[in-house]
From Swiss-Prot:
Domain of life of the native organism: Bacteria
Cited Gene3D superfamilies: HP0062-like domain
Span of domain PE: 1-92
UniProt similarity note: Belongs to the mycobacterial PE family. PGRS subfamily.
Gene encoding the protein: PE_PGRS46
UniProt cross-references to Pfam families, sorted A to Z: PE (PF00934), PGRS (PF21526)
Protein name: Uncharacterized PE-PGRS family protein PE_PGRS46
Compositional bias segments (type: Gly residues): 402-429, 436-510, 718-763
Residue segments, region Disordered: 125-163, 372-510, 718-778
Species in which this protein is naturally found: Mycobacterium bovis (strain ATCC BAA-935 / AF2122/97)
Length: 778
C-alpha cells in the first residue's frame, strides 16, 4: 500500500495563497463588468445596436460564469482549510495512545534494568559534565554528554543498545587560569549495528597553560565504524599550546576505525582508530601549526588496510601510515608534511610521513609528500629621510646697464638614506635704466644619499627685471635641475621653477624655463627574496613478510615561490615655467615647463626555492615482491614576479604670460613627460630536487625498486610591467590683451612620456607600460 504524508502547516499556507488569488480575480472581474456589459452602439442604426447588444450579452455570460467559478473557488479553499485542521486534530488524537503504548512496552524493562527497550537516551545538562543516558536496549541512540564546567571534563556520550549510535561526548570546560579540560569520550555504538559517538572537543586553555585533549571516539559492536576523536582545545594566545586531538574509536567486527581529531595550536593530531577484524584503520588527525599529524590507525586482525597519516601542521611532519591487516592488507599512506610558514619552527617545511608496513600479505604504504618551502618575501624599497639643508641663494645684482643675478648654489648631498638638499634660488638681476635684466639660474638639487635617498629638488630661477624705457628685455632665470635618486634606489628630485621676467618699461619679458626633473634611480628596485627549499618526502612502507611490494617513497616538497621585486622609483617632476609679466606694450611670454625625469627600473623577482629530497622506497616482502620506487625530488618553486618600472615624471607646466599694458601675451609650453622605467626581470625558477629517494630492496623473487628521479625545475617568474610615462605639462595661460593691445596666445601642452620597456628575459616578458597623457593646450 502507499503512504500519504500530510503537513498541516503547508496545507494552511496553500489555502491562504489560493484565497489571495481568488480575491485578485474577483477584483479584476468587477472592474471589467461596467465597460463590457454596457457597450454603447457605434451609431443610431439597427446594425450598430445589434452588434452592441451581442457583445454586451457576451460580457453578461462571462460575469455569470465568473460568479459560479468564484463560488467553486471559495468552496475549494474552505475544504483545504478544513482538511488541514482535520490532520492536526488526528495527529493530536493519535499521539497520546501511541505514547501510552510505548510506555507500556518500556515499563517492565525500565523497572527491572533502569533502561527502556526503545528510545534515545537523555542528554546530559550543559555545564555539569553529566554523561548522556543510554539508548534503548533494542533500539535507540545514546544521549550526548553535557559540557563541563570551567576546568572540568565533559561528560561521556551514552551507549546505544542493540541498534543505534553512541552519543557525542561533551566539550571539556575551558580553563580560567589552568589548562582546559578533556572532552568526553564518545558513546559505544550498538552491539549489532551502529557507529561509535564522536569524542567531545577539549576545553580552551587558560592564560598560560594548554588546551584540553579531545575525547576518544566511541567503539562499536558487530557492524559499524568507530567514532571520530574530538578536536583538541584552543590555545589561549601567543606562547600557549592547544590540546592534542582525541584518538579515533575502534571499529566493529565489520567496520572502520574512526578518524583522529585535529590538534590545537602546537599540538599533534589524534591517532586514527584501529579496525577490529575486517575494515580499514582510521586516518590520523590534522596537526596544529608546528605539530605533526596523527598516525593512521592499524589495520584489522584479518583483512584490511591501515589508515592514512594525518596532514602535518605548519612546518611539521605528516603522520605515519598505519600498518596493514595482520593477514592481508596494505599499509596506509603517510601524511603530507606541513607547509613552511614564517615564524613557525624556523620557517622550515615538514617532512612527509612514512608509509605503513604490511604484515604477511600486502604492499607497504606510500610515503607522504614533503611540505612546500617558504615563499620569498617581496622586495621593499627603502624610504628617504628629509634633508632640511639647502644650497646658497644666488647674489642679487641691481644697477644701470645689463644686470644678471648670481646662480644659486647646489643643494648639499644627503647622508645615508637622506634626500639631497634643495638647490639655492637664483639671484635677482635688475636693470634700473631700461637695459636687460636676467635672473640667475637656480642651483641643482643635492646628490641623494645611498640606501633610498631621494634626489634633491632644483632651486627656483631668479627674477629678471628691467625698469627703464630703453627697450631692454627682462628674462627670468632657469630653474635648477633635480638630482638623480640615490645609488641604491631613490626618487628623482623635482626641477626648480623658472624665474619671473618682469618688465615695467616698454620691452619684452620672458619667464625662465623650468628645470629638468631628476631621474628615478637607474639601479634596480629591491629584489624579492628567494623561496625556501621543499620538505623531504616520507619513506615507503615495507611489503608483506611473505608476499608484497614495498611502498613508493614520497616526493620531495615543492620549493617556495620567490618574492616579487619592488617597483622602480619614479622620475622627478619637471619644474614649472616662469611667468612673463609686462606693464607696458612689450610681449610677455611664459617659460617652458621642464622635462620630467626618467622612471627607474623595477626590481628583479626572487629565485624560486629548490625542491625537496625524495623519500626512499620500501623493501619488498622476503619471498616475493618488488621494492618500492624512490620518491622523486620536489619541483622547484616559481620565480618571483619582476617589479613594475617606475613612473616617468610629469612635465612641468608652462609659465603664464601676463600684461597690464597693451602688449601681447604668450603662455609657455608644457614640459614633456618623462619616460617610464623598464619592468624588472622575472625571478629564476627554483632548481628541481636533485636527490631522489633510493629504491627499496626486492624480495627473493623480485627486484629492487628504481631510484627516484630529479624534480622538475620551477617556472621562471613573470617580467614586471613597464612604468607609465609621465604626463606632459599643461601649457601656460595667455592673459587677456589690454585695451588696444595685441592678441593673447596660450602655450602648447607638453608631449606625454613614453611607456617603459618590458620586463627582463629570464621571466615571462612584461607588458608595455601605457603612454603618458598628452597635456592640454593652454
Amino acid at each position: 500500500m502507499s503512504f500519504v504524508i500530510a503537513v498541516p502547516e503547508a496545507l494552511t499556507m496553500a489555502a491562504s495563497d489560493l484565497a489571495n488569488i481568488g480575491s485578485t480575480i474577483n477584483a479584476a472581474n468587477a472592474a471589467a463588468a461596467l465597460p463590457t456589459t454596457g457597450v454603447v452602439a457605434a451609431a443610431a442604426d439597427e446594425v450598430s445596436a445589434a452588434v452592441a447588444a451581442l457583445f454586451g450579452s457576451y460580457a453578461q455570460s462571462y460575469q455569470a460564469f465568473g460568479a459560479q467559478l468564484s463560488a467553486f473557488h471559495a468552496q475549494f479553499v474552505q475544504s483545504l482549510t478544513n482538511g488541514a485542521r482535520s490532520y492536526v486534530v488526528a495527529e493530536a488524537t493519535s499521539a497520546a495512545p501511541l505514547q501510552d503504548l510505548l510506555g507500556v512496552v518500556n515499563a517492565p524493562a525500565q523497572a527491572l534494568l533502569g533502561r527502556p527497550l526503545i528510545g534515545n537516551g537523555a542528554n546530559g545538562a550543559d555545564g555539569t559534565g553529566a554523561p548522556g543516558g543510554p539508548g534503548g536496549l533494542l533500539l535507540g541512540n545514546g544521549g550526548n554528554g553535557g559540557s563541563g564546567a570551567p576546568g572540568q571534563p565533559g561528560g561521556a556520550g551514552g551507549d546505544a543498545g542493540l541498534i543505534g549510535n553512541g552519543g557525542t561526548g561533551g566539550k571539556g570546560g575551558d580553563g580560567l587560569v589552568g589548562s582546559g579540560a578533556a572532552g568526553g569520550v564518545g558513546g559505544r555504538g550498538g552491539w549489532l549495528l551502529g557507529n561509535g559517538g564522536t569524542g567531545g572537543a577539549g576545553g580552551a586553555a587558560g592564560a598560560t597553560l594548554v588546551g584540553g585533549t579531545g575525547g576518544v571516539g566511541g567503539a562499536t559492536g558487530l557492524i559499524g565504524s568507530g567514532g571520530f576523536g574530538g578536536a583538541g582545545g584552543a590555545a589561549a594566545g601567543v606562547g600557549t599550546t592547544g590540546g592534542v586531538g582525541g584518538s579515533g574509536g575502534v571499529g566493529g567486527v565489520f567496520g572502520n576505525g574512526g578518524f583522529g581529531g585535529a590538534g590545537g595550536l602546537g599540538a599533534a593530531g589524534g591517532v586514527g582508530g584501529a579496525a577490529s577484524y575486517f575494515g580499514t584503520g582510521g586516518g590520523g588527525g590534522v596537526g596544529g601549526d608546528g605539530a605533526p599529524g596523527g598516525d593512521g590507525g592499524a589495520g584489522p586482525l584479518l583483512i584490511g588496510n591501515g589508515g592514512v597519516g594525518g596532514l602535518g601542521g605548519a612546518g611539521a611532519a605528516g603522520g605515519n601510515g598505519g600498518a596493514g591487516g595482520m593477514l592481508l592488507g596494505d599499509g596506509g599512506a603517510g601524511g603530507q608534511g606541513g607547509p613552511a610558514v614564517a615564524g613557525v619552527l624556523g620557517g622550515m617545511p615538514g617532512a612527509g610521513g612514512n608509509g605503513g608496513n604490511a604484515n604477511w600479505f600486502g604492499s607497504g604504504g606510500a610515503g607522504g609528500q614533503g611540505g612546500t618551502g617558504l615563499a620569498g618575501t617581496n622586495g621593499v624599497n627603502p624610504g628617504s629621510i628629509a634633508n632640511p639643508n639647502t644650497g646658497a641663494n644666488g647674489t642679487d645684482n641691481s644697477g644701470n646697464g645689463n644686470q644678471t643675478g648670481g646662480n644659486g648654489g647646489p643643494g648639499p648631498a644627503g647622508g645615508v638614506g637622506e634626500a639631497g638638499g634643495v638647490g639655492g634660488q637664483g639671484g635677482l638681476g635688475e636693470s634700473l635704466d631700461g637695459n636687460d635684466g636676467t635672473g640667475g639660474k637656480g642651483g641643482a638639487g643635492g646628490t641623494a644619499g645611498t640606501d633610498g635617498g631621494a634626489g634633491g629638488a632644483g632651486g627656483a630661477g631668479g627674477i629678471g627685471e628691467t625698469d627703464g624705457s630703453a627697450g631692454g628685455v627682462a628674462t627670468g632665470g632657469e630653474g635648477g635641475d633635480g638630482a638623480t635618486g640615490g645609488v641604491d634606489g631613490g626618487v628623482g628630485g623635482a626641477g626648480g621653477k623658472g624665474g619671473q621676467g618682469h618688465n615695467t618699461g616698454v620691452g619684452d619679458a620672458f619667464g625662465g624655463d623650468g628645470g629638468i626633473g631628476g631621474d628615478g634611480n637607474g639601479a634596480l628596485g629591491a629584489a624579492g627574496g628567494n623561496g625556501g627549499t621543499g620538505g623531504a618526502g616520507g619513506n615507503g612502507g615495507r611489503g608483506g613478510m611473505l608476499i608484497g611490494n614495498g611502498g613508493a617513497g614520497g616526493a620531495g616538497g615543492t620549493g617556495g615561490t620567490g618574492g616579487g621585486g619592488a617597483a622602480g622609483f619614479a622620475g622627478g617632476v619637471g619644474g614649472a615655467g616662469g611667468e612673463g609679466l609686462t606693464d607696458g606694450a612689450g610681449t610677455a611670454e611664459g617659460g617652458t615647463g621642464g622635462l620630467g625625469g626618467l622612471g627607474g627600473v623595477g626590481g628583479t623577482g626572487g629565485m624560486g626555492g629548490s625542491g625537496g629530497v625524495g623519500g626512499n622506497g620500501g623493501a619488498a616482502g622476503s619471498l616475493i615482491g618488488l621494492g618500492g620506487g624512490g620518491g622523486a625530488g620536489g619541483v622547484g618553486g616559481t620565480g618571483g614576479i619582476g617589479g613594475i618600472g617606475g613612473a616617468g615624471g610629469n612635465g612641468g607646466a608652462g609659465g603664464a604670460g601676463t600684461t597690464t599694458g597693451g602688449g601681447a601675451t604668450i603662455g609657455g609650453g608644457g614640459g614633456t613627460g618623462g619616460v617610464g622605467g623598464a619592468g624588472g626581470t622575472g625571478g629564476t625558477g627554483g632548481a628541481g630536487g636533485t636527490t631522489g629517494g633510493s629504491g627499496g630492496a626486492g624480495g627473493l623473487i623480485g627486484w629492487a625498486g628504481a631510484a627516484g628521479g630529479t624534480g622538475a625545475g620551477g617556472t621562471g617568474g613573470q617580467g614586471g610591467l613597464g612604468g607609465q610615462g609621465g604626463n606632459g605639462g599643461n601649457g601656460g595661460t595667455g592673459a587677456t590683451g589690454g585695451q588696444g593691445g595685441d592678441f593673447a596666445l596660450g602655450g602648447n601642452g607638453g608631449a606625454g612620456g613614453a611607456g617603459g620597456s618590458p620586463g627582463g628575459s629570464s621571466g615571462i616578458q612584461g607588458n608595455m607600460g601605457p603612454p603618458g597623457t598628452q597635456g592640454a593646450d593652454g
